[in-house]
């Protein structure tokens, strides 16, 4: 674990991912950005969906208008005939039936296309999120709970699914329906239209008030859901610690507290959301009843040439008009919840990527006939720094593994320095060991070598090149790292070793395992190198996981090694086994080693003793023992413990 990391300061959102709530003025910006994602890849599909929506809406309106013709031109005249002919009525019904079929087909096609558009858009968003996540600096992951980041991929992205597949198409359909129905109602009776619009205004007023209340609770619901996911992820990772200290009840209480908050916010959000439809439906029924009474009175008195057919057609249109108003109110809550999720999605996507202004790259090299270093596409075992110059020329400098710190200061926070005036060097092939108490700055130094963090002052040079001029991906490719917390991936043992170099052959992976002395236990596994590992290698012991991590570093064959307490979790017998392999791995390579067991660094060329971010001693083992300073105290204390 890196010492003295920046204090995590969480915002009002879900443990650091939240931030300010989506404001009303941001809703348009968020919606525009979401739709831009859709149109970028699915504009033709969206145009076809719009056509289907228009056809479906017009079919419904035409079917409602047919009621006037049906009653005034067919049913009433037929009631006045002694021997009516049903053939004209049957023909009319066939025509309206065709209209209904066209509307149904358009609605079906619309739904099918929107499923494709929605799932494709969500897939693209997840890919963009993952791609951007990989470009984020380590600092981001150190200050944001992993469970909350996962919540962005799952819950927040899923809120967009309902909005894209249902809410947006429904809103467009409702808008087209409202316009077409309104025009049709005006043609039938402007007086009844005024009555309808007065009730619609009341419906919209009530919906707006309810939506304003439910919106803030939907945002809180997404925030609380992120907290619950973050807590679950944290407890799953720390389940062994929970059981060791028998804190099951305590963690359950913590979960219940977060879960109750989620329940409360979800209950409040859905309580308001669920009353929108009943309220608007009842207001719609009132509007229907008023129009029926007014229409009947007008038909009886002959006002405005209103007929019985006109009243029936208008009442059908009234239903068609009120329904989209109610649907708009319902979909508004879905959109608000989706925008709350979108705020978190785009907040993560807008996080600045890891800055990298490096231009020096790492390439395979060989010596030509003139003994000049040149670039090659073949893997020769020789690496070179490719250094382009302003005049267009390029020079190649053989990678030696010479790393130098000069007057380096660093702090995780700008106003708090944790490393002070660090001066050290690692010559090619040397083994440099860092020792010191917890929080002294050992791991922080190794984080600076691979540029997980950048220094505030001073210089770090790699083969004489300022590492800020080296492209980060190439810098890290030249480093083999065994982290304190071993992480393995789901897959076979062979695949986990090959992760160090993806183009490594099976033979090279096996050779690396032998070098790390991991070959013996691997062969005893049920399927040997093809044994599947699950759950971060949970079916292996801690020592076995660390041996695989060492083999993974070995197959990369890097010129520089960083071993962050690589053997601190291995038992003494396994440590002796590993040490022989590690000595062979480190031979000829610059190696930076951190270990709590000082016996593992006794043969280091240089031992650097750190205390509170400063180098207080340096030298080899014998020199530091003779000084009887801090190293002597640590070493003798270590021996006493053994």
Regions found by a protein language model. Give the residues of each.
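Membrane-integrated ABC transporters
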Residues: 1-60, 75-96, 110-114, 118, ...
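Short intracellular "coupling" helices and adjacent cytoplasmic loop segments at the cytosolic face
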Residues: 13-23, 119, 127-151, 155-157, ...
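Juxtamembrane helix-loop junctions of ABC transporter transmembrane domains
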Residues: 20-28, 52, 59-75, 90, ...
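Hydrophobic alpha-helical transmembrane segments of ABC transporter permease domains
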Residues: 32, 51, 106, 110, ...
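An intracellular "coupling" helix at the cytosolic face of ABC transporter transmembrane type-1 domains
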Residues: 40-43, 138-139, 155-164, 168, ...
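Transmembrane helices of ABC transporter permease
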Residues: 41, 45-58, 166-220, 293-306
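Helix-loop-helix
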Residues: 77, 184-198, 268, 272-343, ...
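ABC-type nucleotide-binding domain
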Residues: 82, 365-642
